[in-house]
Amino acid sequence: MSSKDQSRLPHEKGFHISWDQIHRDSRALAWRLDGQGPDEGAWRAVVAITRGGMAPAMIVARELDIRVVDTISVMSYHSGGGKADQRRDAKVLKAPDADMMGDGTGILIVDDLVDSGKTLELVRAQYPNAHFATVYAKPQGEPQVNTFITGVSQDTWIFFPWDMALQYVEPYRGTD
């Protein structure tokens, strides 16, 4: 890798996703998952990995008529103080209902993107029989996903619509 490549900022190889695109891709994910659940093709519940998985999970739950929806909050990034986000070890901040989850059988766990796979690896260790689905997947994380729609290169930075305005806008509160 050249020194120019090493100094490239994450957004220099960017993939911008609009609200319309995430909606279409999330519906495509639902279509791919339809009839694949263990209970005569049905899923018992959808669990969104917050925060990025919430919009896709909502769309998947609607399309598949899944009424039981929960979240698991996993933090694996922290703000780099104006620099590109930097990784740290993943940890669960909020877990879904334990009685509902069991070992994950019949549970559909949804996220927007699998990058390194560390977040899904942590969640999969807790719910080994759950089905993991993401809208987008990078090669390093693909082994952690059962179903995804679009593959992107490992060095691509995805700009999701909830992170964007006409230009990047810091959230009102907090950057984690």
UniProtKB/Swiss-Prot annotation:
Q: What is its EC number?
A: 2.4.2.-, 2.4.2.22
Per its UniProt record, the required cofactor names are: Mg(2+)
Enumerate the catalysed reactions: GMP + diphosphate = guanine + 5-phospho-alpha-D-ribose 1-diphosphate; XMP + diphosphate = xanthine + 5-phospho-alpha-D-ribose 1-diphosphate; IMP + diphosphate = hypoxanthine + 5-phospho-alpha-D-ribose 1-diphosphate
Per the UniProt entry, what is one GO biological process?
A: purine ribonucleoside salvage
Quote the record's binding site residues for 5-phospho-alpha-D-ribose 1-diphosphate. 51-52, 88, 111-119
Functional pathway: Purine metabolism; GMP biosynthesis via salvage pathway; GMP from guanine: step 1/1; Purine metabolism; XMP biosynthesis via salvage pathway; XMP from xanthine: step 1/1
Indicate how the chain sits in the lipid bilayer: Peripheral membrane protein
Cleavable signal peptide? none
- List the Gene3D superfamilies: 3.40.50.2020
SUPFAM superfamilies for this protein? PRTase-like
A Pfam family it matches: Pribosyltran
Q: Which UniProt keywords apply?
A: Cell inner membrane, Cell membrane, Glycosyltransferase, Magnesium, Membrane, Metal-binding, Purine salvage, Transferase
Binding positions for guanine per the UniProt entry: 115, 158
Quaternary structure and partners: Homotetramer.
Its job: Purine salvage pathway enzyme that catalyzes the transfer of the ribosyl-5-phosphate group from 5-phospho-alpha-D-ribose 1-diphosphate (PRPP) to the N9 position of the 6-oxopurines guanine and xanthine to form the corresponding ribonucleotides GMP (guanosine 5'-monophosphate) and XMP (xanthosine 5'-monophosphate), with the release of PPi. To a lesser extent, also acts on hypoxanthine.
NCBIfam families associated with the record: PRK09177.1 (NF006613)
Q: What is this protein called?
A: Xanthine-guanine phosphoribosyltransferase
- State the gene name recorded for this protein: gpt
